């Protein structure tokens, strides 16, 4: 410690003439080491200014620039052997050099958490100090700035609106980087490997809100800005490899952070503190399927060591130490999630009014609601009574107070087609005490659809007019076609009026009198002709006495000699060439 005090005294005496406004070397292109969300930019170490002693002279060792960027316990692949690191707390030291180190260490810790870039100058400065750089001394403003930084560090670790534990008992920040100066964890060395950097969130205390911390921080910011003149001086932090004897020299790598950058970082910190609760709430709402995410919202518990819940919420996790061992039923998980959501909303002062009671599960509805059949339902509970599928926005049918999807309703309750036995979904034809699809109701004989004339039924089947009369209507005795309208009944047969005529000459019968021969109607002439009862002489029917000769029939007065025309009433005649002759005429003509 004596060597350290001597070293700090030398540093203060040799840097007393340096201006509080060093040159900002922003034009040099730095290169950086990516470390997660942080970027540290490292530049070659500038040569020592001639008046102050060099780093080698003070420490007696030669430092390799690459070794200077190997912080113990950091996330880089090559690690330095563990060595005791300086411990910085939020309490002020007596000496001004210690105050400077504490204040700068706290500022580096806060700035590192806010994900800003630290720049190191990469330009070889000349041995002669620039006129614009030189000034009388750091003065009282630098000491005032150190004091404000110490107070800011104390406020950040123990804000007035939230109770804070002492540095020795508080749990470590999750994933704090060892190159950043922080508070040791229960006397544990800071050389261990740390996790990823996570923003520190204040603890909740009862019903106090996050806005309770704003007045003190904003007043500190106003005091900080008023105490630092413009242009704002950069705070130079000598960062190098830490060994047992602490070595801090002006020739090592320098880190500068302006007051405007610190103000911007604190504004972003306050914005994140104000929003972290709503982000945690949204993450639980988005995790509506807890069995898929593996973290049910209801399993949120506080750490037994009193860990800050906000730190876990920043990583998108709840405060439970491990995921659940098994999966419960989706219904119980949904109920647990809704109950947790309701309680969280009540804690935030958000009044939620149930939109009704579900008609299936009889529980209040807090999210989407389906209104149907005079009731309210959870969307997942409004299902088809038969297939149990969610109806959603599809059409449904109600029967006996129960909802059915369109498919099951038609399958169960719709009328069936007599032809195909399928359910009738749209238009229906009712005929012959049965129901039919319109496209399946057609003539049983020809398959034609029925027109305006309708159909005729025979033996339980439907026929068109033509096929029905062709198959089942009475047939005409004359033309053998169906009789559709008027008809004549004669000879035990039905006849079309135009078909009831003489079957020989097709002459209609006068006064309805006709002669029947072999079941067919004839006129008188053709009737006697068919029977052979016509007079061979006059070709008229014989109604009375007749003479039969030469296989013919004659009226008595018409049976005469073919030459002299005398009546052959005696019954004697001569026949020649199918003609009758008397005896005398026959002798004269043929003898």
Curated annotation (Swiss-Prot):
A motif (LD motif 5) lies at residues 333-345. InterPro entries: Paxillin_Lim_dom2 (IPR047072), Paxillin_Lim_dom4 (IPR001904), Paxillin_TGFB1I1_LIM_dom1 (IPR047075), Znf_LIM (IPR001781). The keyword Translocase does not apply. The keyword Signal does not apply. A motif (LD motif 3) lies at residues 216-228. A motif (LD motif 4) lies at residues 265-276. Residues 45-54 have a biased composition (Pro residues). Phosphorylated by MAPK1/ERK2. Phosphorylated on tyrosine residues during integrin-mediated cell adhesion, embryonic development, fibroblast transformation and following stimulation of cells by mitogens. Phosphorylation at Ser-244 by CDK5 reduces its interaction with PTK2/FAK1 in matrix-cell focal adhesions (MCFA) during oligodendrocytes (OLs) differentiation. Phosphorylation at Tyr-31 and Tyr-118 by PTK6 promote the activation of RAC1 via CRK/CrKII, thereby promoting migration and invasion. Phosphorylation at Ser-250 by SLK is required for PXN redistribution and cell motility. The modification Phosphoserine is found at residues 83, 106, 119, 126, 130, 137, 140, 143, 230, 244, 250, 258, 261, 272, 303, 322, 332, 340, 533. Residues 17-139, 156-261, 289-338 are annotated as: Disordered. The modification Phosphothreonine is found at residue 132. Residues 89-99, 315-334 have a biased composition (Low complexity). Residues 262-315 are annotated as: Required for binding to PARVA and ILK. One of its GO terms (cellular component) is cell cortex. Keywords: Acetylation, Cell adhesion, Cell junction, Cytoplasm, Cytoskeleton, LIM domain, Metal-binding, Phosphoprotein, Repeat, Zinc. A motif (LD motif 2) lies at residues 144-156. Belongs to the paxillin family. Cytoskeletal protein involved in actin-membrane attachment at sites of cell adhesion to the extracellular matrix (focal adhesion). Recruits other proteins such as TRIM15 to focal adhesion. Interacts in vitro with VCL/vinculin as well as to the SH3 domain of SRC and, when tyrosine phosphorylated, to the SH2 domain of CRK. Interacts with GIT1. Interacts with NUDT16L1/SDOS. Interacts with PTK2/FAK1. Interacts with PTK2B/PYK2. Interacts with ASAP2. Interacts with unphosphorylated ITGA4. Interacts with RNF5. Interacts with PDCD10. Interacts with NEK3, the interaction is prolactin-dependent. Interacts with PTK6. Interacts with TGFB1I1. Interacts with SORBS1. Interacts with PARVB. Interacts (via LD motif 4) with PARVA/PARVIN. Interacts (via LD motif 4) with ILK. This is Paxillin. It comes from Mus musculus.
């Amino acid at each position: 410690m004596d060597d350290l005090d001597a070293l700090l005294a030398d540093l203060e005496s040799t840097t007393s003439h340096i201006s509080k406004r060093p040159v900002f070397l922003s034009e040099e292109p730095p290169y950086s080491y990516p470390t997660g969300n942080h970027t540290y930019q490292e530049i070659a170490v500038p040569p020592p200014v001639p008046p102050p002693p060099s780093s080698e002279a003070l420490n007696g060792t030669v430092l390799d620039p690459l070794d200077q960027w190997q912080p113990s316990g950091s996330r880089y692949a090559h690690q330095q052997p563990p060595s005791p690191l300086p411990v910085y707390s939020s309490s002020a030291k007596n000496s001004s050099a210690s105050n400077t180190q504490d204040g700068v260490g706290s500022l580096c810790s806060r700035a590192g958490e806010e994900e800003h870039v630290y720049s190191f100058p990469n330009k070889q400065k000349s041995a002669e100090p620039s006129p614009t750089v030189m000034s009388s001394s750091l003065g009282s403003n630098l000491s005032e700035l150190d004091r404000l930084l110490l107070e800011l560090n104390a406020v950040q670790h123990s804000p007035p609106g939230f109770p804070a534990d002492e540095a020795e008992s508080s749990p470590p920040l999750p994933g704090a980087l060892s190159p950043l100066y922080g508070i040791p964890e229960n006397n544990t060395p800071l050389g261990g490997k740390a996790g990823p950097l996570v923003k520190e969130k204040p603890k909740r205390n009862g019903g106090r809100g996050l806005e309770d911390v704003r007045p003190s921080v904003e007043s500190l910011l106003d005091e900080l800005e008023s105490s630092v003149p413009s242009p704002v001086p950069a705070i130079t932090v000598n960062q190098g490899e830490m060994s047992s004897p602490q070595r801090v020299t002006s020739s090592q790598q320098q880190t500068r952070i302006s007051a405007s950058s610190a103000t911007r970082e604190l504004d972003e910190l306050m914005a994140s503190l104000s929003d972290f609760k709503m982000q945690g709430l949204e993450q639980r709402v988005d995790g509506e399927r807890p069995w898929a995410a593996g973290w049910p919202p209801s399993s949120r518990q506080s750490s037994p060591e009193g860990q800050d819940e906000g730190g876990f919420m920043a990583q998108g996790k709840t405060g439970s130490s491990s995921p659940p061992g098994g999966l419960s039923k989706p219904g119980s998980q949904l109920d647990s999630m809704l109950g947790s959501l309701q309680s969280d909303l009540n804690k935030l002062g958000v009044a939620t009014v149930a939109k009704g009671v579900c008609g299936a599960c009889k529980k209040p509805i807090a999210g989407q609601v389906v209104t149907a059949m005079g009731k309210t339902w959870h969307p997942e509970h409004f299902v088809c009574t038969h297939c149990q599928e969610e109806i959603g926005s599809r059409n449904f049918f109600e029967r006996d107070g129960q909802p059915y999807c369109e498919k099951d309703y038609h399958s169960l309750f719709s009328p069936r087609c007599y032809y195909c036995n399928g359910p009738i979904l749209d238009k229906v034809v009712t005929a012959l005490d049965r129901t039919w699809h319109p496209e399946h109701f057609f003539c049983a004989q020809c398959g034609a659809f029925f027109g305006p004339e309708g159909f005729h039924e025979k033996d339980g089947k439907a026929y068109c007019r033509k096929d029905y009369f062709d198959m089942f209507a009475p047939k005409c005795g004359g033309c053998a076609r169906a009789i559709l309208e008027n008809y004549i009944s004669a000879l035990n047969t039905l006849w079309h009026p135009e078909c009831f005529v003489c079957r020989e000459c097709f002459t209609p019968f006068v006064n309805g009198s006709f002669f029947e021969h072999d079941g067919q109607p004839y006129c008188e002439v053709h009737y006697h002709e068919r029977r052979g009862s016509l007079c061979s002489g006059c070709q008229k029917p014989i109604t009375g006495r007749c003479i039969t000769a030469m296989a013919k029939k004659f009226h008595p007065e018409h049976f005469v000699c073919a030459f002299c025309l005398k009546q052959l009433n005696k019954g004697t005649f001569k026949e020649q060439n199918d003609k009758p002759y008397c005896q005398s005429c026959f002798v004269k003509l043929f003898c």
